[in-house]
């Protein structure tokens, strides 16, 4: 996988990224950078829009594929999004450049760099992996950082009065994303219904 990722970075290829245990579900995006354990991807949604930055744990990935018919179709959809002006509605490319500058000045992993960015700027992130039950995904914000874990406040869209908080070890996180449609939607919910918890 490391070689496939290196090739995708070098050629700026659009790729399909499959996580272990999911044969049919995959993410689409541009591989930006990798370190020993993690890879940073600029995600693209089915409408051809940039949909946040995602850090994947490489050990959780099954395969990375480029040059499929689906990706050729996606390239056309991305071209339309660029032409019509909705490719990068959240200024993801600007954020990515800032994140890369920080990453180049630090000894932290890509995962910790993304988590620190989210924590210091009070940004909602989405985390998934082996948290509580395998495959669970949580959107919320980091309450506090510790050496081996974070205290994470997540949003339960079905019970807005709840204020669930869980401790998540860095080792449990297989995927972390922010600056996406989902995280911006969750931010709007937090600001509307729990403004005292946030900022």
Question: What would you call each of these model-derived segments?
Answer:
Residues 25-33, 136-144:
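Short beta-strand-centered aromatic/proline hotspots
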Residues 35-36, 146-147, 170:
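Residue-level signal for tight coil/turn positions that link beta-strands
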Residues 37-41, 148-153:
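Short aromatic-glycine-enriched beta-strand elements
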Residues 1-26, 45-51, 55-134, 156-199:
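Short glycine-rich, low-complexity segments
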Residues 137-140, 150-153, 161:
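Short conserved catalytic/interaction loops centered on acidic-Pro-aromatic/His motifs
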